A protein has these predicted regions:
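Eukaryote-biased RCC1-like beta-propeller repeat architecture
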Residues: 1-162
Length: 162
């Protein structure tokens, strides 16, 4: 379980991570299994060692930074709508439960921060790299183009003016 983390509100597209599209009128504990924070067939069943570091809520999706004591670094997981790739899983298929953003597992430095906005998400690593994904049709991801990205893309913030 995510200790102390609960979600409530509009459950459309699974944004609450509760396993359904139902709204939650009161704070409801998010059930989490080891599958939410690992990659492999052996990942199943509850993992009481998982700890939530941060939660970021977008318009119809949620991004979570998780720490699993059996892994060397924190992991990013997401749930909800992925109509523009805002979950970072490489497809437009939404999710009803948290699943890891696999493209971030190979970062050279651990992810230390996350954020979620309207149909977009981001992660920052300990070495200052920024990764963005989701809706980008107006260039709002800072990737140098005007298209959506379905997986995290590193953005060079040194190009940004002061």
């Amino acid at each position: 379980m995510l200790f102390g983390v609960r979600t409530w509100g509009k459950g459309e597209d699974g944004a609450l991570g509760l396993g359904s599209r139902e709204n939650a009128r009161v704070p409801t504990r998010v059930q989490l299994t080891s599958r939410s924070c690992s990659w492999g067939e052996e990942a199943s069943g509850p993992d009481m060692g998982l700890r939530c570091v941060k939660v970021a809520c977008g318009s119809n999706h949620t991004v979570v930074l998780l720490h699993n004591p059996s892994l060397p670094v924190a992991q990013v997981a997401s749930t909800g709508s992925s109509s523009y790739g805002q979950l970072g899983h490489g497809s437009c298929d939404g999710l009803l439960e948290l699943r890891p953003v696999r493209a971030l597992q190979d970062c050279k430095a651990p992810v230390t921060d996350i954020s979620a906005g309207h149909e977009a998400s981001s992660a920052t690593t300990a070495d200052g790299r920024h990764f963005l994904w989701g809706r980008g049709e107006w260039g709002q991801l800072g990737t140098g183009d005007e298209r959506s990205h379905w997986r995290p893309v590193a953005v060079d913030v040194s190009l940004m003016s002061d």
